[in-house]
Regions:
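Cytochrome P450
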Residues: 1-184
Length: 184
């Protein structure tokens, strides 16, 4: 609703990040007014020097991840014993394999980071890459506008075209030919 009309804007900032943050807040039943913390925690969780190859402010990273753990530990205790609830924290509490996960803080934080980074990065990257691909291929965009029934296939194709996890690669374990293409 708040997108500018007839003027340029930053798609990643205005749509991709906002959309994924709203989705994550809904999945966690996280306070909506604090949802930007989810994006921040995702970004710092994925910013290890091992993953980025660059410099990382370790103190900021530790402080941010500590805040994430403390926030979700508080949420866990607030929801404990509550009936129903289909948010991810409530589901973890009800599953016998994860019901005591909060008592293992590093495991709890690790699982939170997997869920947050997985939900944030994959959706943000796919949505952004999809819009970029449609802008670079206007004939394909015209096909979608003419036939919205193509959209379900478009989603799968965007995920294939623009890998959701830019740092995840596939490595061939042996040379082979696949659909006429050499893979080494």
């Amino acid at each position: 609703d708040n997108l500018p009309l007839e003027e340029e804007f930053d798609w990643v900032d205005k749509v991709s990040i906002n959309l994924t943050t709203q989705m994550l807040a809904t999945l966690f039943d996280f306070p909506f007014e604090e949802r930007s913390k989810l994006t921040y925690w995702s970004d710092i969780a994925a910013s290890s020097p091992e993953m980025t190859g660059g410099d990382v402010n370790t103190e900021e990273r530790v402080a941010g991840l500590t805040e994430c753990l403390e926030t979700f530990t508080r949420i866990w205790h607030e929801r404990k014993g509550r009936e129903g609830g289909f948010d991810l924290i409530s589901l973890l509490q009800r599953d016998p394999h994860t019901a005591d996960m909060v008592d293992r803080p590093m495991e709890f934080l690790g699982n939170l980071c997997l869920l947050i980074v997985g939900g944030n990065d994959t959706t943000r990257n796919s949505a952004t890459g999809g819009v970029l691909a449609l802008n670079q291929n206007p004939a394909e965009y015209d096909k979608l506008r003419a036939d919205p029934g193509l959209i379900p296939n478009m989603v799968s194709e965007i995920i294939r075209w623009q890998t959701p996890l830019a740092h995840m690669r596939r490595t061939a374990t042996r040379d082979l030919e696949f659909q006429g293409q050499q893979i080494k």
